[in-house]
Regions:
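Bacterial N-terminal signal peptides
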Residues: 9-17
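Beta-propeller domain segments
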Residues: 84-86, 159-322
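Bacterial N-terminal signal peptides that target proteins for export
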Residues: 1-9
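Acidic, Gly/Ser/Thr-rich repeat motifs that build Ca2+-stabilized beta-propeller blades
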Residues: 22-163, 215-224, 228, 280-320
Length: 322
């Protein structure tokens, strides 16, 4: 769990002011400087980590020596608007996984995932293992966070501003997908078992733009943080074959002009209910479950970053309640 300590430490570099639910105060120490719009990070060991920059770079950084190496790749990364580009990165057992905005044709793009082996500061056999479909010409809501649980790769795919398309499991809009680590499709996925009308990669539907994802070291479940519209950001569990309901519901939020979404309900029977919601929105970004020695008061807490408030928020989550 030492690595989680460093992850928490590094996330603090990008936060101007930190606050928790208990109003604790923390001082920051700069670990590395000179990054250009960093988006994702993943530790290789105690000193080395991978960092993505939205403009398309994958960097290997040594915090001890301050050395920075750019890893070559041939991905068609397109930095779109203020959300798209090279996004998350995950290092797992020698493999590097990245999610990114891929230019497919014209201005049409998708959330895609590539993987390859890291060997002597080189990415070998680095190629796409997933491309969300269909490509669309919008510049928001990519999702794209990555996590590994039980040798499965989980990834979030935003609904790309396609609204009710998040209720149509014959496309990838507004979904959580699950792959084997080599990119193949698990035979136990809903589309191959209980939900035969779903695309085979899809594990869960009905999300809007999940930019946070983490596996809990306590119960070994996958959790997400999801952007609502004007209100309705939430923290919740990833559950096989379930539906969070976007945009039948908006989790307590409204459209940006103040109009209701669906019938105005925050939740309906038959849909998966978020564990915790923020109204008004805080613009939730990434999250971790903290376990470490440096901040014992935060042990087993859920730490959530807020883009809007530029704060780090601590949730005391136990027994499916906050």
């Amino acid at each position: 769990m030492k690595r989680l300590k460093y992850i928490f430490y590094f996330y603090c570099l990008f936060i101007v002011f930190i606050n928790t639910a208990h109003s604790e105060s923390y001082s920051l120490e700069k670990a590395f400087d000179g990054l250009n719009r960093p988006w994702g990070m993943s530790f290789i060991d105690d000193h080395n980590l991978l960092v993505t920059q939205k403009s398309g770079e994958i960097l290997k950084i040594n915090l001890k020596t301050q050395e920075k190496i750019e890893l070559d790749h041939n991905l068609k990364v397109l930095e779109v608007g203020w959300q798209g580009g090279m996004l998350d990165v995950l290092f797992h057992e020698g493999m590097v996984y990245v999610s990114y905005t891929e230019k497919r044709y014209g201005k049409h793009t998708t959330t895609s995932i590539a993987a390859g082996k890291l060997v002597n500061d080189r990415l070998e056999n680095f190629k796409n293992i997933f491309r969300s479909d269909p490509p669309v010409d919008t510049d928001i809501h990519w999702g794209s966070r990555l996590a590994v649980k039980d040798n499965y790769l989980f990834a979030s795919v935003g609904e790309r501003a396609q609204g009710m398309a998040a209720q149509d499991p014959t496309n990838h809009f507004g979904t959580i997908i699950r792959l084997n680590l080599d990119g193949s499709i698990p035979k136990s996925n809903p589309g191959l078992t209980t939900n035969k009308d779903w695309l085979p990669e899809i594990y869960q539907i009905g999300v809007r733009n999940p930019q946070g994802m983490a596996v809990s070291p306590i119960d070994n479940e996958v959790y997400i943080t999801n952007h609502g519209p004007k209100g309705g950001d939430f923290f919740g569990k990833v559950s096989k074959g379930s539906n969070y309901g976007w945009m039948l519901v908006a989790w307590g939020g409204t459209d940006y002009d103040g109009s209701i979404i669906g019938d105005g309900s925050a939740w309906k029977p038959g849909l998966l209910k978020p564990i915790y919601r923020w109204i008004p929105s805080i613009a939730v970004s990434n999250m971790i479950f903290y376990q470490g020695e440096r901040f014992p008061e935060l042990n087993n807490k859920v730490l959530v970053t807020s883009l809007k408030a530029q704060k780090l928020i601590s949730l005391d989550y136990k027994n499916d309640k906050v």
